[in-house]
């Protein structure tokens, strides 16, 4: 079921909070975007990504839960919302059907390579916790709270592998090599 962002802003009280505290709301489906390419993408050639997020300090605020499509809903899977619907909806639907051409773990991986959230604040209160910190690490902790091995969560394993390879490349730059 697809809902308009305006309906969601109203239904969950975001518009009321926005007005009360003078904080703006942005519908990422209707904002300017740029085409982003990355050789590390696993399925997309390029992604239309909201320009407003590129240089912003991005905080992901999910509720931790198991999920049929993602295995686990966390800070990184929450970024699926950054895919603008006008580019990823099907011809006869308002949902983002084009991100479901393949397993969603690939869409989560690729959108997070455009820009990973800078911080995660995960409501895991159902399990007695609030998780706060680096998004990948917080999602790993969330998986543990849900009784999963994080390496069995497709998008977490893919992102960890990609980011580990990048860290390994960074470590090799400037190392003294003995003969």
Model-identified regions with their sequence ranges:
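Extended, low-polarity segments enriched in aliphatic/aromatic residues
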Residues: 2-179
């Amino acid at each position: 079921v697809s809902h308009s962002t305006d309906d969601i802003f109203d239904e969950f009280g975001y518009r009321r909070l926005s007005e009360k505290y003078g904080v703006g709301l942005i519908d990422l489906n209707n904002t300017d975007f740029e085409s982003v390419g990355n050789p590390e993408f696993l399925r997309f050639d390029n992604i239309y990504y909201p320009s407003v997020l590129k240089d912003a300090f991005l905080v992901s605020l999910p509720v931790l839960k198991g999920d049929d499509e993602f295995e686990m809903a966390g800070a990184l899977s929450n970024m699926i919302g950054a895919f603008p619907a006008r580019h990823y909806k099907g011809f006869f639907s308002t949902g983002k059907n084009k991100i479901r051409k393949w397993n969603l773990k690939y869409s989560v991986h690729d959108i997070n390579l455009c820009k990973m959230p800078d911080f995660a604040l995960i409501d895991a209160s159902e399990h007695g916790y609030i998780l706060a910190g680096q998004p990948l690490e917080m999602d790993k902790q969330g998986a543990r709270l849900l009784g999963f091995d994080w390496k069995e969560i497709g998008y977490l394993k893919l992102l960890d592998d990609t980011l580990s390879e990048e860290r390994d490349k960074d470590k090799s730059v400037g190392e003294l090599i003995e003969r």
